Regions:
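Buried, small/hydrophobic-residue-enriched core segments of structured protein domains
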Residues: 1-40, 90, 96-105, 114-364, ...
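Low-complexity, highly charged intrinsically disordered N-terminal segments
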Residues: 29-90
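Glycine-rich beta-to-alpha transition loops that act as phosphate-gripper elements at the mouths
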Residues: 111, 376-384, 408-412
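Short beta-strand/loop segments at the ligand-binding rim of alpha/beta enzyme cores
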Residues: 360-361, 367-376, 403
């Protein structure tokens, strides 16, 4: 297994910085700061402080295993490699001195994790505690930066989803606020590298319990001392297993079989392997008695198309005298022409169709809530803006926000950089 000397976890230009320090420099004070929301999603003005404990625990472990526990020759060999790298003789005595010391002589301070700050407020500081190691403080800038920006960024984005879910559930189904921690489910693992699976998964878990990033469970235990399982999920199908059943017993029988395999609890079924609308309008009515008799909820999961229209239906349409429906295309806010022919199912959308079949209740706020034996989740192309649009469109049709669970994927948690919130580790005092 590739386990390089931990000294390699830096930028090449750091190698010469010890010799560039002013003579007599004994201490160097570093800061970790989100400096800007210029490139952040709109309306985000604060950043969540998160990930510092994980960052320094990981860094400690890395240096312990791949530097301090190794023979002293690893420091000498690193110096030889740097001589070849720079094309001149390199003095590695300070790395040898660090190895002799046996630990990273740093004092780290951090804001409490989970609080929000405006930009330009340091989330953590670090300073060398032993004279002669001022060079070490920002030698670690590279690895601290690469470790720390992702968990804070993901926690900040997760909080935006949480606040919007809180608001819409409070307005449309306040007696079900307990559902909010499960209304945005982490689907992002497959779009992230293994370390980001951990850091981003933990970031999501600061606001939600719903997650398929199961690496979050041991990571929370190790880095944060979480004794309980901090996330939850359900039995759920994917297209591959659906296809094996559809081609052998048919889709309707597939649903019936799976409800027998999983007779209790929530069962999520990917529903557009072939035809979403056929599954909803033909197979679900045929299986209604089984679904309603089951001790749990069957969750329908569309997996393609415009999530807003699939969930909520198409609200911009016209109907010909013969009953044919067409979606409407607009240009610059003005009606232009018919766009394409649509079905009644497409016009209604998943939630209304499920209501037509299974019904439910109307709560005190006047919003419809699906029968607890049926539900829906959508986990493709979800963004913060689409989350709000889905809640708005459902409310306009008289449905509570609690009728839908959203899968938040790698677009949300991967489509970011260190510059999203302007994170930087910099020296501030010597």
């Amino acid at each position: 297994m590739f386990k390089p000397n931990a000294l390699f976890l830096t930028d090449g230009y750091k190698i010469g910085h010890k010799a560039m320090l002013a003579p007599g420099t004994t201490k160097l004070y570093g800061t970790w700061i989100p400096r800007s929301v210029k490139y952040a999603p709109k309306n985000i003005i604060k950043i969540v402080s998160f990930g510092q404990q994980m960052t320094w625990r990981w860094l400690h472990d890395e240096f312990e295993e791949n530097f301090f526990k190794q023979p002293r020759e690893v420091a000498t060999q690193f110096g030889n490699d740097m001589s070849a790298y720079l094309g001149l003789q390199y003095d590695a005595s300070h790395f040898e001195a660090l190895h002799n010391l046996g630990y990273l002589p740093l004092k780290v301070k951090s804001l409490p994790e989970g609080i929000e700050t405006a930009p330009n407020i340091p989330h953590m500081t670090f300073i060398n505690t032993v004279d002669g190691f001022a060079w070490l403080t920002l030698y670690l800038e590279t690895i601290v930066s690469s470790l720390a920006w992702k968990p804070s960024t993901s926690a900040t984005l997760a909080l935006q989803y949480r606040r919007r879910a809180d608001l819409w559930v409070k307005n449309t189904d306040p007696s079900s606020m307990w559902l909010v921690p499960f209304m945005c489910h982490d689907f992002s693992a497959r779009g992230l590298n293994p370390h980001d699976m951990i850091s981003s998964g933990l970031g999501h878990a600061t606001s939600f319990r719903g997650s398929d990033s199961i690496i979050t469970i041991p990571a929370a235990r190790y880095y944060y001392g979480e004794t309980d399982v901090c996330i939850n999920s359900v039995n759920a199908s994917e297209h591959s297993v659906s296809t094996t059943k559809i081609f052998t017993v048919g889709e309707q029988q597939m649903l019936s079989d799976w409800m027998k395999t999983f007779p209790t609890g929530i069962l999520s079924v990917v529903s557009d392997t072939f035809d979403l609308w056929q599954l909803i309008t033909q197979y679900l009515p045929a299986l209604k008695d089984e679904i309603m008799a089951r001790d749990g909820k069957l969750v329908i999961r569309p997996d393609s198309g415009d999530p807003v229209d699939i969930i909520c239906g198409i609200d911009d349409y016209i109907q010909n005298d013969d009953g044919t429906l067409y979606s409407v295309r607009y240009t610059s806010g003005m009606f232009r022409d018919r766009n394409k022919k649509i079905t009644v199912s497409e016009q209604k959308g998943v939630i209304e169709l499920l209501w037509d079949i299974f019904g439910g209740t109307t709560n005190e706020q006047g919003y419809k809530v699906l029968d607890p034996h049926i539900g829906a989740i959508y986990g493709d192309s979800i963004t913060i803006d689409r989350q709000v649009e889905i809640y708005e469109r459902l409310a306009a049709k008289g449905f509570a926000a609690t009728n839908i669970v959203l899968g938040v994927g790698s677009y949300t948690y991967q489509y970011n950089t260190r510059d999203t919130f302007g994170f930087a580790a910099k020296g501030a005092w010597f």
